[in-house]
Regions:
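Terminal amphipathic alpha-helical/low-complexity segments used for targeting or macromolecular assembly
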Residues: 1-24, 29-30, 35-36, 72, ...
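Structural signal for interior beta-strand "rungs" in well-ordered beta-sheet cores
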Residues: 19-205
Length: 287
């Protein structure tokens, strides 16, 4: 994800764009707003903020220090962007929040800037962050991601491109979610979610490959079947994780999908979710 540098935007002063900015808005003199940024009444934009061309900021929005917002974003009333992180170790470091082009941030979303761990919180392009969701410090959210209403994403989480969180999901800190994964509403996510799969039930478990989502993204039937075969080895063949990965590397052709899945699982810090069993215990949120 990249945010267009502000020096590529036409130089704009508040005097030039005052027809787009309501007089009952406060904008710090050092904030940089590109052409055609529209700001509705009672919003506050702090210093060290950059907003790209064509972005709309609704009423009663607070955009705090370190925000870097791309082009054509929509920020709905009540949102708070780039607030200080809720981290007791934070000592006022100069950190930022990056939001990619064409991202929509709905009502009362809160997004916190980074700490010295990553120095930034990053949200990709074309994302939809629905109402009352929270993205904590140092998260890396890919492009085309959807966080449904009241999703709560703790610090240092990584969400891959095209990931979807159902409403009221809670994601444990340092968790990773692979690209094209779908997580059902109300889930507690404490283990890593590999790419291309669905996760559901309690405790959160493997629920099959996200075939519908992959078809919508243009994956061929052959490629989807290849991914299904990979996950049959991981979850249905009776092998432990190490054995399954070795089997995939020895017996399956080297494809981008195979290599991505194997690498994701091998590098998982929290371990991946398991196949559902009636004897499962809720260990997903245990440290």
């Amino acid at each position: 994800m990249s945010v267009t540098p502000m020096n590529e935007y036409p130089a704009t002063t508040l005097k030039n764009v005052n027809k787009m900015i309501h007089p009952h808005t406060y904008i710090h003199p050092n904030a940089k707003l590109a052409t055609n940024v529209k700001v509705d009444p009672f919003s506050v934009i702090h210093q060290n903020v950059e907003i790209g061309e064509g972005t709309w900021v609704g009423s009663n929005v607070t955009i705090m220090e370190g925000a870097r917002i791309g082009k054509n974003c929509r920020i709905f009333p009540g949102a708070v962007i780039s607030a200080m992180p809720q981290d007791l170790k934070f000592e006022g470091e100069d950190t930022i929040t990056e939001i990619g082009d064409n991202t929509t941030i709905r009502e009362f979303v809160t997004i916190h800037r980074g700490t010295k761990d990553r120095w930034k919180t990053k949200i990709g392009k074309n994302c939809m962050i629905m109402a009352y969701s929270h993205v904590a410090h140092d998260c890396i959210i890919g492009s085309n991601v959807i966080l449904s209403n009241n999703s709560q994403v703790a610090g240092h989480v990584i969400l891959g491109d095209w990931a979807i969180l159902g409403g009221m999901c809670a994601v444990h800190q340092f968790t990773k979610v692979g690209q094209h994964a779908f997580i059902s509403g109300g889930s507690l996510v404490g283990k890593d979610i590999p790419p291309y799969i669905k996760a559901g039930r309690q405790p959160l478990s493997y629920a099959g490959v996200n075939s519908v989502g992959l078809k919508r993204r243009g994956f061929t039937i052959d490629k989807i079947n290849h991914i299904l075969d990979i996950y049959r080895v991981i979850y249905n063949k009776g092998l432990n994780t190490s054995q399954a990965l070795e089997y995939l590397e020895e017996e399956f052709p080297a494809t981008d999908e195979r290599d991505e899945i194997v690498t994701f699982i091998r590098e998982s810090g929290r371990g991946i979710i398991k196949r559902y069993s009636k004897n499962s215990v809720d260990e997903d949120i245990a440290d």
